[in-house]
């Protein structure tokens, strides 16, 4: 069964220490954390390192580096530095810079900064960004030409951008250190309606098997046993389970049940 990580988006109203506790309570194999460099302190780094050590959970990823036309690269690099100090395996990046050559240049700069840190720089595509499709993302990464570059697949963004599992299967496995996973309704928001796109991404995701995304095909298209960050941003889930640990437990159980079912179907 694929290792599963509690993505920070499942518990967005909670800080990193509570997120780690929730990942433990939910029976996850790893955890992801949201990093805010302007308010992140050395004491918080020490506290998070201690909490991770006590939990025994690896830190699958930290997020988010959001590349913009006037990006403060020093702040982005600090996000990487914090991730490296915490032992993160990946840092998640998105871009709202319409100049894709500039995005590639900044990603390359971040990859160089990450050298020796044991961390990959993963670009996520989606219609809410300027890297809207898997093809655009691959073109950016081809321009980066650095071994630490990576591509982050999220089924909802694959579907909403009009891509398919076949497009995912065509990605070189070396570019896929991990993936996000969730389900979602069949109805796609109008890609020109930014608010609808954002609501779809942060409020309307669903437990695996409860929506209409082709998750079995998507899982088969990904490298075998790839770690899955369960990115279940759901208003309904937040309202039904205001406690972070309970929310993580429900999500972890549903995820493992679906993965067991997927394994049976594949055998």
Predicted regions mapped to residue ranges:
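A short, acidic, flexible beta-alpha connecting loop/helix-capping segment that sits on the rim
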Residues: 11, 227-246
């Amino acid at each position: 069964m694929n290792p599963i990580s509690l993505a920070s988006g499942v518990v967005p109203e909670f800080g990193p220490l509570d997120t780690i506790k929730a990942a433990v309570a939910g029976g996850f194999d790893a955890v992801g954390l949201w990093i805010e460099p302007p308010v992140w302190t050395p004491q918080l780094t020490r506290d998070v390192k201690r909490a991770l050590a006590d939990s025994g959970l690896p830190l699958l990823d930290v997020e988010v580096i959001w590349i913009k036309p006037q990006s403060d690269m020093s702040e982005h690099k600090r996000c990487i530095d914090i991730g490296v100090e915490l032992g993160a395996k990946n840092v998640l990046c998105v871009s709202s810079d319409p100049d894709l050559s500039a995005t590639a240049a900044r990603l390359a700069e971040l990859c160089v900064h990450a050298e020796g840190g044991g961390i990959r720089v993963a670009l996520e595509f989606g219609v809410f960004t300027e890297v809207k499709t898997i093809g655009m993302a691959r073109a950016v990464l081809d321009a980066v030409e650095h071994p630490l570059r990576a591509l982050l697949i999220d089924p909802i963004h694959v579907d909403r951008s009009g891509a398919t599992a076949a497009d995912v299967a065509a990605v070189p496995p070396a570019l896929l250190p991990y993936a996000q996973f969730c389900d979602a309704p069949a109805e796609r928001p109008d890609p020109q309606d930014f608010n609808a796109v954002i609501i779809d991404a942060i409020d309307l995701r669903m437990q695996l098997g409860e929506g209409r995304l082709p998750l079995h095909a998507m899982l088969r298209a990904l490298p075998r046993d790839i770690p899955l960050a369960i990115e279940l941003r759901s208003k309904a889930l937040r309202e039904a389970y205001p406690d972070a640990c309970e929310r993580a437990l429900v999500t972890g159980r549903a995820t493992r049940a679906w993965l067991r079912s997927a394994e049976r179907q594949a055998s």
